[in-house]
């Protein structure tokens, strides 16, 4: 799976969870500051992405994933 494919999958998951248009979800966007996600929504997205990619994202790592790009890079290392 390429980085671009991961980004598309993450964009779709984030857009669905937050009720945003996929075009609003770019790698540079911060979940909390730019996309308005609260802590619960971020944790739910992490769980959704764990299921989608069949990976485990440790809690201490999840806390460091501030942007969409951070998540894509992290998932890339786990695949």
Swiss-Prot record:
Pfam families in alphabetical order: PP-binding
UniProt GO molecular function: acyl binding; acyl carrier activity
Record's signal peptide: none
Domain Carrier, first and last residues per copy: 4-79
SUPFAM superfamilies named among the record's database cross-references: ACP-like
Post-translational modification: 4'-phosphopantetheine is transferred from CoA to a specific serine of apo-ACP by AcpS. This modification is essential for activity because fatty acids are bound in thioester linkage to the sulfhydryl of the prosthetic group.
GO cellular component: cytosol; membrane
Sequence positions bearing O-(pantetheine 4'-phosphoryl)serine: 39
Function of the protein: Carrier of the growing fatty acid chain in fatty acid biosynthesis.
HAMAP family: Acyl_carrier (MF_01217)
Name recorded for this polypeptide: Acyl carrier protein
Protein's organism: Exiguobacterium sp. (strain ATCC BAA-1283 / AT1b)
Source organism phylogeny: Bacteria, Bacillati, Bacillota, Bacilli, Bacillales
Gene for this chain: acpP
């Amino acid at each position: 799976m390429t980085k671009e494919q991961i980004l598309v999958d993450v964009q779709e998951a984030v857009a669905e969870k937050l009720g945003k248009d996929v075009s609003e979800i770019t790698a540079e966007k911060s979940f909390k500051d730019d996309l308005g996600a609260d802590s619960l929504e971020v944790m739910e997205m992490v769980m959704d992405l764990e299921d989608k990619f069949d990976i485990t994202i440790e809690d201490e790592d999840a806390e460091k994933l501030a942007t969409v790009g951070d998540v894509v890079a992290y998932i890339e290392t786990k695949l």
